[in-house]
Swiss-Prot record:
Tree of life domain: Eukaryota
GO cellular component terms, A-Z: extracellular space
Glycosylation sites: 260, 289
Name used for this protein in its record: Serine protease inhibitor A6
Gene name of the encoded protein: serpina6
Induction section of the entry: By estrogen.
Family under the similarity heading: Belongs to the serpin family.
Compositionally biased intervals (Basic and acidic residues): 32-60
Tissue: Liver.
GO terms for MF: serine-type endopeptidase inhibitor activity
Function (record text): Not yet known.
Main subcellular location of this protein, as a coarse class: secreted
Membrane-crossing segments per the record: none
């Protein structure tokens, strides 16, 4: 008997849909009449308000949440660096994942892990018992999940958990109570001896919880399955300050020194926080909430050499300064699939996937192990109505009036919540036209 963990297609599908909201006809007509620079001038007051909100959002975390944020940051960069190393075999492969959802799922599993299995999970997640107790970590995740799922919050970030257990298996009451208390995880009996019907029920559950975004989370189920762990993350962000779709045009993007692809390049003149040094240039794009996207553009050909650290990311954030920028960035849609079983083994979390696994904190009735763990995340950065707008075939030409910020080569993307103090998503965009 084994534990089947579907951290796939929905611990799995982290949908970060970044859409530009259309103006009503009256405002949109006036916006287009006034032109690019005039509209940017009128938008500066809104930009300034957004910059003030950024300052207000930061620094509201509790001591425990700040420590958890640091640990999640360490885990995030470790996982990113491991995935980046693995991707060198496919230099045009994009990377995208949700570190906080992976952390939540494995901390939840840690509630039922014991001995070396338990220690490996905590160490792999960068847990430091000298700074925080394990119970404090679970409490911090409890607050994070409650906050993220609060319908009164401006952000649209939702974490959900569910455990589907073979109806003949006795799950320890303490474990069931803990996952409900800390991770809002529902525990549901399931007849996995009828895998087709079980698959249908699981997919319907996820379809309902994700408002139809995910139609088919699970394609196959083994009749020997004893438990399925579902961890899903949904995120939808709207730019705090919109791009004008009529300014989008076709432009070239350099995948490497020898390869160019054609992309749809958006353009906006406005106030942004930016930073530049000899290695890269960075810009922060705020959403209509407490989150922001950070784009890091290394020199062409240098992205594969970049090794992230928490210290380096903190340096970037602390160095950001506000200025008027003429921004050119591509629309893109990428997905990233991570075979966690292979990647986490390389990061020290290995026993849980073998017969050495000790998950007797979940059930003492049978010997459990994690037989499958994968993670899919999808990011869409686009404009409303782009397909309906006739795009001209021309190279982007930044204005000379303000400093241009042109994103036309591979870049890193991070989506960060200031009030949650966490990296929600991380990725590397090598080719914006490669959706896989």
């Amino acid at each position: 008997m084994h534990l089947l963990v579907y951290l796939s297609l929905f611990f799995a599908l982290a949908l970060a849909s970044v859409t530009e909201i259309s103006l009503d006809n009256k405002h949109r007509h006036r916006h287009e009449q006034q032109g690019h620079h005039d509209s940017a001038k009128h938008g500066h007051q809104k930009d300034k308000q957004q910059q003030e909100q950024i300052k207000n959002d930061e620094g509201k975390l509790t001591k425990e949440e700040k420590i958890l944020s640091e640990e999640n940051s360490d885990f995030s960069v470790n996982l990113f660096n491991q995935l980046s190393t693995e991707s060198k075999r496919s230099p045009r492969k994009n990377i995208f994942f949700s570190p906080i959802s992976i952390s939540a799922a494995f901390y939840m599993l840690a509630l039922g892990a014991k001995s070396e299995t338990h220690q490996q999970i905590l160490k792999g997640l960068s847990f430091n018992k000298k700074k925080l107790s394990e119970s404090q970590v679970h409490e911090a995740f409890k607050r994070l999940i409650e906050d993220s799922n609060n319908p009164m919050k401006a952000h649209q970030f939702t974490i959900g958990n569910a455990l589907f257990v073979e109806q003949t298996v006795n799950i320890l009451k303490g474990f069931e109570e803990n996952v409900k208390h800390y991770y809002q995880a529902g525990v549901f009996p399931m007849n996995f001896k009828d895998p087709d019907n079980a698959k249908k029920q699981l997919n319907n559950y996820v379809k309902d919880k994700t408002h139809g975004v995910i139609q088919e989370m699970i394609r196959e189920l083994d009749s020997n399955t004893e438990m399925v762990l579902v961890n899903y993350v949904l995120y939808k962000g709207e730019w705090a300050n919109n791009f004008n779709p009529t300014l989008t045009q076709k432009s070239l993007f350099s995948v490497d020194k020898n390869t160019n692809v054609t992309v749809q390049m958006m353009n906006r003149l406005g106030l942004y926080r930016t930073y530049q040094d000899d290695d890269c240039k960075i810009i922060e794009l705020p959403y209509k909430n407490d989150t922001a996207m950070l784009l890091v553009v290394p020199q062409l050909g240098k992205i594969q050499e970049l090794v992230l650290t928490s210290k380096l990311i903190n340096h970037w954030y602390e160095s950001l300064a506000t200025s008027i920028v003429d921004l050119y960035m591509p629309t893109f849609s990428i997905s990233g699939k991570v075979v966690l079983k292979d990647t986490l083994r390389k990061m020290g979390i290995s026993d849980i996937f073998t017969d050495k696994a000790d998950l007797t904190g979940i059930s003492e009735q049978i010997k459990l192990k994690v037989s499958m763990a994968s993670h899919n995340a999808v990011l869409n950065v686009n404009e409303f109505g782009t397909e309906a707008v006739g795009a001209t075939s021309a190279q982007a030409s930044p204005t000379k009036l303000f400093p241009p910020f042109l994103i036309d080569s591979p870049f890193l993307v991070m989506i960060y919540s200031r009030t949650l103090g966490s990296q929600l998503f991380m990725g590397k965009v090598m080719d914006p036209t490669n959706a896989q």
